[in-house]
C-alpha cells in the first residue's frame, strides 16, 4: 500500500494538481486530498489506491522500497 506522502510526492514530480490526478485516475479529488493529508495509511479504499498507483506508474512514476518508502520519476530510456 502506498502512503499519503508517496502519493503527494509522486503527483508533484509530475507537476500535476490534485484535480489532474483525480481526473486521470477517476478518483475523487476529495479522496486524493484526504489521502495526501496522511503521512501513513492514505485512508482510501484498496480500489482507489490501485487506480492511483496504476495512473502514476503509467505516467512514469516508480515507487521505491527499502528504508523509507519513496518515489522517483523513471528516465525515458528505462523500460
List the model feature ranges, each with a label:
Residues 16, 27, 61:
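Short glycine/serine/threonine/alanine-rich loop segments
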Residues 1-2:
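A detector for short, charged/polar N-terminal pre-domain segments
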Residues 46-64:
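DNA major-groove recognition helix of helix-turn-helix/homeodomain DNA-binding modules
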Residues 26-44:
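Recognition helix of helix-turn-helix/homeodomain-like DNA-binding domains
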Residues 7-20:
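Short basic helix-loop element that most often maps to the first helix and adjoining turn
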Residues 61-79:
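Helix-turn-helix/homeodomain-like alpha-helical modules used for DNA recognition
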Residues 20, 24, 34-35, 47, ...:
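Cell-envelope/extracellular anchoring and linker segments
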Amino acid at each position: 500500500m502506498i502512503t499519503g506522502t508517496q502519493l503527494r510526492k509522486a503527483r508533484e514530480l509530475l507537476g500535476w494538481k490534485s484535480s489532474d490526478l483525480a481526473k486521470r485516475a477517476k478518483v475523487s479529488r476529495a479522496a486524493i486530498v484526504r489521502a495526501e493529508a496522511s503521512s501513513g495509511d492514505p485512508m482510501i479504499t484498496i480500489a482507489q489506491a490501485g487506480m492511483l498507483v496504476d495512473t502514476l506508474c503509467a505516467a512514469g512514476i516508480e515507487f521505491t522500497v527499502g528504508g523509507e518508502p519513496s518515489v522517483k520519476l523513471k528516465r525515458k530510456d528505462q523500460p
